[in-house]
Amino acid sequence: MIRRMAGQWPAWARPEHPVLRYELGKSKRLSTRARLLRLAAMAIGVILLGVAGYLIATGLLTHPPGQSVTESIHAVMFWPLLAVQFLTGIAALTLTASTVADEIQRRNWDNLRSTALGAELALHARWAATFYRLRYLLGAILLLRLVLVGGILYDLTAFQGRYLDLLMNGIAPELPLVAGVLLLSLLMTGALIAPVTAVGFDGALGLLLSVVVRQRTYSILLQVLATFIRLAITAGLLHAMTQFMRGALAIDGAASWLLAAGYGGLADWGLAFLDLGVYGELWVMVPFGIMLGLALLLFALFQAFLADQMIALAVRYSERHG
């Protein structure tokens, strides 16, 4: 998956490949009316999410969303974007979790397995198709994150360009300004890569489930279970992180760093870190907190590695166990 992110696309991941073209062609072509209705529904959804985000950020219109423009933008966007990210991850899982069951239902699976590289290409194509089908959601997530990255760059110009100096004052460990700039750039890189690798990981997990559990009923039950587990992890880490930031959770040292790193990697894919005010607070509250951006980037790359391994495992399992 890391090679794919670098632009080295294999043949089966390109839309002109016949297997991927067949996979993408399974979706029913929508009429003009259906497309317009879908666009209208999406527009209404965006408006509702924006209104909900503003109401949450302002405490039901009782206070401003933030003390600055960038803080306000982040506060309004946080909850809607978190919800969209969660739904995108679940969608990636469900799009691949029934891969083998679908092919068995179409009576194609035995033919694919008897053809050289047939099952392997089918599994790879289904995984690649996930990105094509979720491209609009992923594109929206990345676009909004780019807006937040732009907010960070804008904030760095505050105090005559000395804002980063002020944030790094008194943190542990003490680092030169150039190191702070480098680590902040790694955060922004990790925050843009994490959604892509998370979708790839969820899609690969669904693919692995599909070759192990082929009965549709059990597959659906596992998907529901995975959704609840994901929701519990996200909600638990979000609650713990909120309590920690408010000073209501008495942890320090390595425990606080692991909480912040786990939250950034598993709960919101580094979304909270894209508010430079919040991220600067973590530098002070958490030992080595300035390294959280590096941790997020490494976690995203590790997710990509795990996705590759799960896809390879799914291919081997399908070849050995039919």
Predicted regions and their residues:
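Hydrophobic alpha-helical transmembrane segments of membrane proteins
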Residues: 1-108, 121-322
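Short helix-to-coil transition segments within interhelical loops
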Residues: 113-120
